């Protein structure tokens, strides 16, 4: 019995149709269709060879089918990477394209690239040679051997190869190369795991240069900075003040009056000459004269009566008239006299402007 593989089967194909097609060359013992491929068991080897010779690339429902002798699935199938695939391409169309060169175990499209697993390595090489850099559905696709491998669960399988560095003899979880591609250092990890003694942290700040107990280094540093900054600030301020004085003097207008110019340029004036203050006798005389002038002015000013409450005194009514208007007038006259005595005696006993002469003399 010979087992034949039929690939790239159309969707319309049925088992009865395939069976009748292969029975033309010999007795068919079994026929199975799995998705877009199938298997046919023929009793005679010669009949199987005739079926392969006549039915390979046979057009069935408008699709060319592939017929060849079936082989057991290889443990290490050849994986191809197919790049630059058209977005309208489907798995079925891509699989049919690669089945022209041999049996395809798996075909998966991921975005604009795909992975095709071919059963035999020689078929994969032929597919690369025939399909690489060729037009397929309006785009030029690129076919090459895939460098990625099927990853098993961590710790499962044999130590045949690491997925990080590609070397054999260890799993990826034990690989000395981390995910970024650098060689990892497991010394600290093992020390933490097995309780190695680490260098203790200092309790105080004595070991640090800028944080010692006395803060001596930091204090001296800031003192030097403050001294330098203060000296620079004073020097800058002095220079700016000197420049401002020069600019101000240069911007003063020229003296137009000749008399004033001669007066200013006269050598008889001493800029450092000081005049003596007046003596005590002269100051007292000036103060007395000023006080007399102020007294005369204030007496004439404050002598007038401007109060609206002060009225001319009229005849005082008798007591028999009761508490009428006359009694209220009597009370108002008494209160006005009391107010007049207060104004004349307490407030104007001392002149307010008598002390001004003492200051105006200077």
Swiss-Prot record:
One of its GO terms (biological process) is circadian regulation of gene expression. CDD domains: RRM1_RBM4, RRM2_RBM4. Residues 2-72, 78-148 form the RRM domain. There is a cross-link at residues 79, 92 (Glycyl lysine isopeptide (Lys-Gly) (interchain with G-Cter in SUMO2)). The keyword Transmembrane does not apply. PROSITE patterns: RRM (PS50102), ZF_CCHC (PS50158). Residues 196-362 are annotated as: Interaction with TNPO3. Pfam families: RRM_1, zf-CCHC. The keyword Zinc-finger applies. One of its GO terms (cellular component) is nucleus. Gene3D superfamilies: 3.30.70.330, Zinc finger, CCHC-type. It is found in: Nucleus; Nucleus, Nucleolus; Nucleus speckle; Cytoplasm. Phosphorylated. Phosphorylated in vitro on Ser-307 by SRPK1. Phosphorylation on Ser-307 is induced upon cell stress signaling, which alters its subcellular localization and may modulate its activity on IRES-mediated mRNA translation. Phosphorylation on Ser-307 is induced upon cell muscle differentiation. The modification Phosphoserine is found at residues 86, 307. A zinc finger (CCHC-type) spans 160-177. One of its GO terms (molecular function) is cyclin binding. RNA-binding factor involved in multiple aspects of cellular processes like alternative splicing of pre-mRNA and translation regulation. Modulates alternative 5'-splice site and exon selection. Acts as a muscle cell differentiation-promoting factor. Activates exon skipping of the PTB pre-mRNA during muscle cell differentiation. Antagonizes the activity of the splicing factor PTBP1 to modulate muscle cell-specific exon selection of alpha tropomyosin. Binds to intronic pyrimidine-rich sequence of the TPM1 and MAPT pre-mRNAs. Interacts with TNPO3; the interaction mediates nuclear import of the protein and is disrupted by nuclear Ran bound to GTP. Interacts with EIF4G1 and WT1. Interacts with EIF4A1; the interaction is modulated under stress-induced conditions. Interacts with AGO1. Interacts with AGO2; the interaction occurs under both cell proliferation and differentiation conditions and in an RNA- and phosphorylation-independent manner. Interacts with DDX5; the interaction occurs in an RNA-independent manner. This is RNA-binding protein 4. The lineage of its organism: Eukaryota, Metazoa, Chordata, Craniata, Vertebrata.
